[in-house]
């Protein structure tokens, strides 16, 4: 019999209950006990949703991040919070979010009382994790309370529980040494704590533990490979069964290593590594379980179940009880329930599967393998009809778009003149001071903005009323920026629900959901639009709003667009053509918007590519192909304008030291980047690479409520000036200010502008 299980379930709730619960708690509007009760209720509901599985995950629920949870389980707390003796949950949030100082003395140590932990992308997804911090003298100590609490809840509910933990080698690999120490040198101290954790779970009657080691799908040197052998030899003596889980890619040169580790089962991502199944069957010891991720855990398209059974049936005959079935990875990366999508186009809806529907697909596959296809004939027929409908739909294929793609040539991606000539023309037109100040685009999405949007969508506010409300918010943003004496202004994006969904709603070839939310980090959720067909732009999307904002001020107003690579990487993308083709289609559509903004008199146009690095394949050998079409797509978008129109781009969480040449090749006049959480570490790339254009290193972390001091910002900019000529530096926050409150934004930007003025005086 085939065993079914799941690697993880979305934790936010079908209606984002966790997000709203967290925000109430952080604002002091609910108690700690109420938040913990909400967590328990979500876990209860999610285990009920997974009741048909043979094994359901526990430990996948986190109030902020599963990697941060593992740090607390291992007793690896940053030194700056180790002396805090209050509630563990509050300490947890101190690491996740930081805490502003209450006094000048606290400010002296940092930009606030407690600095937030560094946050970065979880492999090549749009989820972010809190980076574990290590020092040469780091010690570990077991705190299993979180897992034991969830295990007790699951047992009481009758769940056949499979605890999920992050493996020791991946945990070290994901972290960062805060001194010059070697992370792997900590492995001997870490392994006994893992052993104690497994012993603790064994004592609770747990049979299987899922231990995630996704770095096995990346390129590993000999030292890291040896770390796997050492780690699992040490854990082999435990009496508990280990399912080693890999996902997000192929094992490739790590296949033999993964197959040889002394564990009881191996999970692979059979969406990406389907070609490796036969080799694994040959290499795995005869008694070992092979779990195949046959349902895509990262996209929302229905699985072709009949096609999946065509290759699973021979495998089931070969492996028998040793075959397990699961999604390819945790379902954290997809929305919860398609059944909520009552307003989604019925035809498009028939092509989709969210987390609950993927579990239904898993059940159909397992039933067909265990009892024969006839047992689920109706479900298989319905699935086949949906797959065929999508394949044949004229809504998916637009001949005019395909013809435009065929006409793309190199000239489309080139500016008229090189940067040095453009810079002088832009300087004359914009007349900006040294260290010009700007923000990245969005200002706080206030309750009034959200209420107006909600009323408009519900039909309670007409279009004229909605436009008036948004114009009032735009005017407020402009007046605040003028009062702050910022140099290049933004309109604040009051009218935008999301930097990608806003555009997806206005492009042909896109559909959008009501409740298709996925977690990005903490309480931050995004609702990726659904790219189902060929992309085109029926009409201008932003010109009216930007032109109105520009009419309110004589200062330059940035046109704000999301770039094609980011729209692609933050969408649920069609899987029936190469991603590069979809990206070129987006580039042509956004290019039309860029040219319309320029015609409307907009002098500065920002094209955000926040997710450029996110699309990089996990293996470096595959980078060049991705970067080629990603950079080409940006250049097609940006390079139709005149020399005196200044093109900006923004990248967040982009550890781009290793792709700096490609970023330079994008040829944006100004790039703004996230650097504050890494203390300008991202600028190390400029020690050896002479970036030719202008750059704005982010000077304060907008993901934390901390208010940076003027001196702190000046210090960061001085570090930047050691690498970038002062005349090419801008001063700006790390990212957009949408998630902050005006009470936080005004003092932070006041200090930022004051810092820029101080720098100008020092330069003069």
Swiss-Prot record:
Binds 1 zinc ion per subunit. CDD domains: CIMS_C_terminal_like, CIMS_N_terminal_like. L-homocysteine binds at residues 440-442, 493, 608. Its cofactor is Zn(2+). Pathway: Amino-acid biosynthesis; L-methionine biosynthesis via de novo pathway; L-methionine from L-homocysteine (MetE route): step 1/1. 5-methyltetrahydropteroyltri-L-glutamate binds at residues 16-19, 121, 524-525, 570, 614. GO terms for molecular function: 5-methyltetrahydropteroyltriglutamate-homocysteine S-methyltransferase activity; zinc ion binding. Pfam families: Meth_synt_1 (PF08267), Meth_synt_2 (PF01717). InterPro entries: Cbl-indep_Met_Synth_N, Cobalamin-indep_Met_synthase, Met_Synth_C/arc, UROD/MetE-like_sf. L-methionine binds at residues 440-442, 493, 608. It comes from the Bacteria. The keyword Repeat applies. It is an enzyme of class 2 (transferase). Its EC number is 2.1.1.14. The keyword Transcription regulation does not apply. Zn(2+) binds at residues 650, 652, 674, 735. Signal peptide: none annotated. The active site is at 703 (proton donor). Keywords: Amino-acid biosynthesis, Metal-binding, Methionine biosynthesis, Methyltransferase, Repeat, Transferase, Zinc. It catalyses: 5-methyltetrahydropteroyltri-L-glutamate + L-homocysteine = tetrahydropteroyltri-L-glutamate + L-methionine. Coiled coil: none annotated. PANTHER family: 5-METHYLTETRAHYDROPTEROYLTRIGLUTAMATE--HOMOCYSTEINE METHYLTRANSFERASE. HAMAP family: Meth_synth. Belongs to the vitamin-B12 independent methionine synthase family. Catalyzes the transfer of a methyl group from 5-methyltetrahydrofolate to homocysteine resulting in methionine formation. This is 5-methyltetrahydropteroyltriglutamate--homocysteine methyltransferase. The lineage of its organism: Bacteria, Pseudomonadati, Pseudomonadota, Betaproteobacteria, Burkholderiales. The gene is metE.
């Amino acid at each position: 019999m085939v065993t079914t299980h799941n690697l993880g379930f979305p934790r936010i709730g079908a209606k984002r209950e966790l997000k709203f619960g967290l925000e109430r708690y952080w604002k002091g509007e609910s108690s700690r006990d109420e938040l913990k009760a909400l967590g328990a209720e979500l876990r209860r509901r999610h285990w009920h949703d997974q009741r048909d599985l043979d094994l359901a995950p526990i430990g996948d629920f986190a109030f902020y991040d599963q990697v941060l949870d593992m740090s607390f389980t291992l007793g690896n707390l940053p030194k700056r919070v180790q002396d805090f003796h209050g509630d563990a949950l509050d300490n947890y949030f101190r690491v996740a979010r930081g805490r502003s100082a209450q006094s000048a003395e606290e400010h002296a140590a940092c930009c606030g009382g407690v600095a937030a932990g560094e946050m970065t992308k979880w492999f090549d997804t749009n989820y972010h994790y809190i980076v574990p911090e290590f020092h040469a003298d780091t010690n570990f100590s077991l705190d299993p309370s979180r897992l034991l609490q969830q295990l007790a809840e699951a047992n009481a509910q009758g769940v056949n529980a499979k605890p999920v933990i992050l493996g020791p080698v991946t945990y070290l690999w994901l972290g960062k040494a805060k001194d010059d120490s070697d992370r792997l040198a900590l492995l001997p101290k870490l392994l006994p704590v893992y052993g104690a954790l497994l012993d603790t779970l064994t004592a609770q009657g747990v049979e299987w533990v899922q231990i995630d080691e996704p770095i096995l799908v990346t390129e590993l040197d000999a030292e890291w490979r040896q770390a796997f052998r050492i780690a699992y030899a040490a854990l082999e003596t435990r009496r508990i069964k280990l399912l080693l889980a890999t996902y997000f890619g192929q094992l490739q040169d790590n296949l033999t290593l993964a197959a040889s580790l002394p564990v009881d089962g191996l999970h692979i991502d059979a969406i990406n590594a389907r070609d490796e199944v036969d080799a694994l069957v040959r290499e795995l010891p005869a008694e070992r379980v092979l779990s195949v991720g046959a349902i895509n855990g990262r996209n929302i398209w229905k699985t072709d179940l009949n096609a999946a059974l065509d290759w699973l049936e021979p495998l089931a005959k070969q492996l028998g009880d040793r075959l397990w079935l699961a999604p390819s990875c945790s379902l954290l990366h997809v929305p919860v329930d398609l059944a909520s999508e009552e307003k989604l186009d019925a035809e498009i809806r028939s092509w989709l599967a969210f987390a609950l529907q993927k579990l239904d697909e898993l059940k159909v596959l397992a039933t067909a393998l265990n009892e024969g296809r006839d047992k689920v004939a109706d479900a298989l027929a319905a699935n086949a009809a949906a797959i065929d409908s999508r394949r044949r739909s004229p809504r998916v294929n637009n001949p005019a778009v395909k013809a435009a793609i065929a006409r793309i040539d190199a000239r489309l991606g080139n500016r008229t003149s090189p940067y040095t000539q453009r810079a002088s023309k832009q300087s004359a037109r914009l007349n900006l001071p040294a260290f010009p100040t700007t923000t990245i685009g969005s200002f706080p999405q206030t309750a009034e903005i959200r209420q107006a949007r909600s009323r408009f969508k519900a039909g309670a506010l007409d279009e004229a009323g909605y436009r008036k409300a948004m114009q009032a918010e735009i005017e407020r943003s402009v007046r605040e920026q003028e009062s702050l004496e910022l140099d290049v202004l933004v309109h604040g994006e009051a009218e935008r629900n999301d930097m990608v969904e806003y555009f997806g709603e206005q492009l042909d070839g896109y559909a959008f959901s009501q409740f298709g939310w996925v977690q990005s980090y903490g309480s931050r959720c995004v609702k990726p639009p659904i790219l189902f067909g060929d992309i085109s732009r029926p009409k201008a999307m932003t010109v009216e709003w930007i032109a109105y904002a520009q009419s309110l001020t004589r200062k330059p107003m940035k046109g704000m667009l999301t770039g094609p690579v980011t729209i692609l990487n933050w969408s649920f993308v069609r899987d029936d053509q190469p991603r590069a083709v979809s990206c070129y289609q987006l580039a042509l559509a956004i290019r039309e918007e860029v040219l319309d903004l320029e015609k409307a008199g907009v002098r500065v146009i920002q094209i955000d590519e926040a997710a450029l690095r996110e699309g990089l394949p996990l293996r470096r050998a595959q980078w060049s192909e991705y970067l080629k079409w990603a950079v080409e797509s940006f250049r097609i978008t940006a390079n139709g304008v005149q020399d005196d129109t200044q093109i900006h781009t923004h990248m967040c969480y982009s550890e781009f030291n290793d792709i700096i040449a490609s970023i330079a090749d994008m040829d944006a006049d100004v790039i703004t980047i996230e650097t504050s959480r890494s203390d300008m570490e991202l600028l190390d790339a400029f020690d050896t690479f002479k970036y030719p254009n202008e750059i704005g290193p982010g000077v304060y972390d907008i993901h934390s409520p901390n208010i940076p001091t003027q001196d702190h910002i000046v210090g960061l900019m001085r570090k930047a000036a050691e690498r970038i000529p002062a005349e090419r530096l801008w001063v700006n926050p790390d990212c957009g200010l949408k998630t902050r409150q005006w009470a936080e934004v005004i003092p932070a930007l006041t200090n930022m502008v004051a810092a820029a003025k101080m720098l100008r005086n020092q330069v003069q």
